[in-house]
C-alpha cells in the first residue's frame, strides 16, 4: 500500500505528517519505525497522523508516534505543523483561523496566520510539586537541589511533562551534557525530568538549551520554552511576552500569570511531499 505524506519541520524538529482524514491508514508500530528511519524510510523525529475528531468540540484529532513505534501524548512543535498541514491541504474551511485539535490528553486550541506562524494554547502550567511530579515539602518559586556535589537552584514546572529550569550566565558554556543527565535522573524527580538552561538577556528575551529526558539535547523544545518563561516570570525576571531563542530558532511565549494558559507562537514549514510504500 502506498501512502502519501508531507515532511514538515518546526525549529528543526521534523515530522512526517499523514492524512488519515481522507485516506484510510492505520500504520502499525513496525510501519511507524520504517517511516521514521532516516536510512531506510523518510526519517523524522515523530510521525503525526491527522484523524477525524471523536469529540464534538474538536475539528480534528491527531496521533503522535515516536521513532520506536510508541505513542506520545502531545508535542508543541508537532501540533503547529499539523495545523499548518490541515490548512495547506484544504481541510480547514476558508476564513477559519482558529481550530480545536483533539489529542489523547484533551483539546488544544490553535490559531493560524496566513502563510505564517502558528499559535498554540499549551494549557495552564502545573506548579504543585506532587503533580509535576517533584519531591518537595511545598510549592515554591525556586528550589535547591544537591547534584554532583553542588547545590543548584531551579524552578520546577509541568507543561504536561516535567521540567526543571536553571538560570545560567551563558548558555553556550552551560554544562548541559553533564548537569543535564544528572538532574534528569535525580531521585527527587520520580518520572525523570527535562532540564532547561536559561540565559536572561532582557525581561522580554531569553536564550535556552534543553536536555530532554531520554533524548539528550535537542534543537527545540516547545514545552521547555513554555516552562522556562513560566519559571522566569515566577522568579521575577521576565515579563508577559518573551522571545525564546533555541538552537533551532525562535519561539514567542505569552503567559499572563497564575491560573492563565500559556500561548506559544512559532514556525511550521513544509519541506517536501511524497509517497512511501507500507507493506
Curated annotation (Swiss-Prot):
EC category name: isomerase
Alphabetized InterPro entries for the sequence: DAP_epimerase_AS, DAP_epimerase_DapF
EC number: 5.1.1.7
Site (Important for dimerization): 272
Gene Ontology CC terms: cytosol
Known pathway: Amino-acid biosynthesis; L-lysine biosynthesis via DAP pathway; DL-2,6-diaminopimelate from LL-2,6-diaminopimelate: step 1/1
Active site: 75 (proton donor), 221 (proton acceptor)
Reaction catalysis annotation: (2S,6S)-2,6-diaminopimelate = meso-2,6-diaminopimelate
Keyword Amino-acid biosynthesis annotated: yes
Domain of life the protein comes from: Bacteria
Gene Ontology terms for molecular function: diaminopimelate epimerase activity
Subcellular location: Cytoplasm
Major subcellular site: cytoplasm
GO BP: any one term: lysine biosynthetic process via diaminopimelate
Residue sites binding substrate per the record: 13, 46, 66, 76-77, 161, 194, 212-213, 222-223
Alphabetically ordered keywords of this record: Amino-acid biosynthesis, Cytoplasm, Isomerase, Lysine biosynthesis
Positions bearing the site annotation: Could be important to modulate the pK values of the two catalytic cysteine residues: 163, 212
Stored PANTHER family: DIAMINOPIMELATE EPIMERASE, DIAMINOPIMELATE EPIMERASE, CHLOROPLASTIC
Function: Catalyzes the stereoinversion of LL-2,6-diaminopimelate (L,L-DAP) to meso-diaminopimelate (meso-DAP), a precursor of L-lysine and an essential component of the bacterial peptidoglycan.
Protein family (similarity comment): Belongs to the diaminopimelate epimerase family.
Subunit annotation: Homodimer.
Protein name per UniProt: Diaminopimelate epimerase
Species lineage: Bacteria, Pseudomonadati, Pseudomonadota, Gammaproteobacteria, Chromatiales
Amino acid at each position: 500500500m502506498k501512502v502519501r505524506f508531507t515532511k514538515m519541520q518546526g525549529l528543526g524538529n521534523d515530522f512526517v505528517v499523514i492524512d488519515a482524514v481522507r485516506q484510510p491508514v492505520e500504520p502499525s508500530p513496525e510501519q511507524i519505525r520504517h517511516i521514521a528511519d532516516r536510512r531506510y524510510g523518510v526519517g523524522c523525529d515523530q510521525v503525526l497522523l491527522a484523524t477525524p475528531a471523536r469529540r464534538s468540540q474538536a475539528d480534528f484529532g491527531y496521533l503522535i508516534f515516536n521513532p520506536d513505534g510508541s505513542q506520545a501524548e502531545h508535542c508543541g512543535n508537532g501540533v503547529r505543523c499539523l495545523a499548518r498541514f490541515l490548512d495547506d491541504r484544504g481541510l480547514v474551511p476558508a476564513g477559519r483561523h482558529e481550530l480545536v485539535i483533539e489529542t489523547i490528553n484533551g483539546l488544544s486550541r490553535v490559531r493560524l496566520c496566513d502563510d505564517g506562524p502558528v499559535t498554540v494554547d499549551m494549557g495552564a502550567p502545573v506548579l504543585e510539586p506532587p503533580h509535576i511530579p517533584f519531591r518537595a515539602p511545598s510549592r515554591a518559586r525556586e528550589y535547591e537541589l544537591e547534584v554532583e556535589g553542588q547545590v543548584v537552584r531551579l524552578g520546577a514546572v509541568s507543561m504536561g511533562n516535567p521540567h526543571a529550569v536553571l538560570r545560567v550566565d551563558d548558555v553556550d558554556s552551560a554544562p548541559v551534557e553533564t548537569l543535564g543527565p544528572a538532574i534528569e535522573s535525580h531521585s527527587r524527580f520520580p518520572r525523570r525530568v527535562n532540564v532547561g538552561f536559561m540565559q536572561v538577556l532582557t525581561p522580554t528575551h531569553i536564550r535556552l538549551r534543553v536536555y530532554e529526558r531520554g533524548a539528550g539535547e535537542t534543537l527545540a523544545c516547545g514545552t521547555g520554552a513554555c516552562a522556562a518563561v513560566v519559571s522566569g516570570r515566577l522568579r521575577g525576571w521576565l515579563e508577559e511576552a518573551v522571545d525564546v531563542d533555541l538552537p533551532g530558532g525562535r519561539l514567542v511565549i505569552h503567559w499572563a500569570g497564575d491560573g492563565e494558559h500559556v500561548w506559544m507562537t512559532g514556525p511550521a514549514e513544509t519541506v517536501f511531499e511524497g509517497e512511501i510504500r507500507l507493506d
